[in-house]
Amino acid sequence: MQQFPRLARVGLGFRRELIPALKSGVPATIDFFEIAPENWIDLGGGAARDLLFFTERYPFVCHGLSLSIGGPAPLDEILLQKIRQFLDQHRVLLYTEHLSYCSDDGHLYDLLPIPFTEEAVKYVAERVRRTQDILERRIALENASFYVASPISDMSELDFIRAVLLEADCDLHLDVNNVYVNSINHDYDPVDFIRALPSDRIVYMHMAGHHKEAENLIIDTHGADVIDPVWSLLDQTYGMHGVAPTLLERDFNIPPLEQLMREVLHIALIQAQHADSGDASAT
């Protein structure tokens, strides 16, 4: 499989609304960008030229939306071939996907949780290995937010994630906000959850905001500022596992670049504090 240079430390989701501001000058704190390949693969014209302008100058990560790695439908190998060509064309450093599914006989337009079972571990792992073979690179799976536990689950979310990583021999894209969301919705300690994850598999992290629907129900929206408990959880995550490349994810209610940069700088500040304290895991 292809080997790629390590990502730098702090990234921002690349959104079309931000392109004019970014063309005027990318702030020095932004080390890399992230896109969903499905949103760009078949585009031509000005959009394609804009993307190439930035991928020629900055490192990029691709975070997939529609592979449906845990879904019952056959793996979309035509899509995977397109993704591989796209990753090669734009020299993308890392490809990640959601540890969930989004299609059955048709696209479901949402990311749904996989039942936490031994059978599902083997099924997902087989599909991940096939994905890695086609893409010719190692991938990372992102822990997903979910709101209703499957009645057929026979293992915990944590045990399921660890088992899939081991069986598939892939890496972990740790979404810190998703852990917080699930900890509120399913009543567990997010620090204990993150502590039990394998440090050597964590290659990438996300930070994002959410919507508080009720006292014991929050929705992962990527449409609001990161709240203090999630910032604290990121700080503790770095303390437990070391600093990994971390991206600010904002998909809705996108504010001006200047406002997003406050949160990007907050990530950089927390990382710097861990570097100053002698954290040996700097990338």
From Swiss-Prot:
Protein name (record): UPF0276 protein Nmul_A2550
UniProt cross-references to InterPro entries, sorted A to Z: MbnB/TglH/ChrH, Xyl_isomerase-like_sf
NCBIfam families: PRK05409.1
Domain of life the protein comes from: Bacteria
Family to which the UniProt record says this protein belongs: Belongs to the UPF0276 family.
Origin species: Nitrosospira multiformis (strain ATCC 25196 / NCIMB 11849 / C 71)
HAMAP family, per the entry: UPF0276
PANTHER family hit by this protein: UPF0276 PROTEIN HI_1600
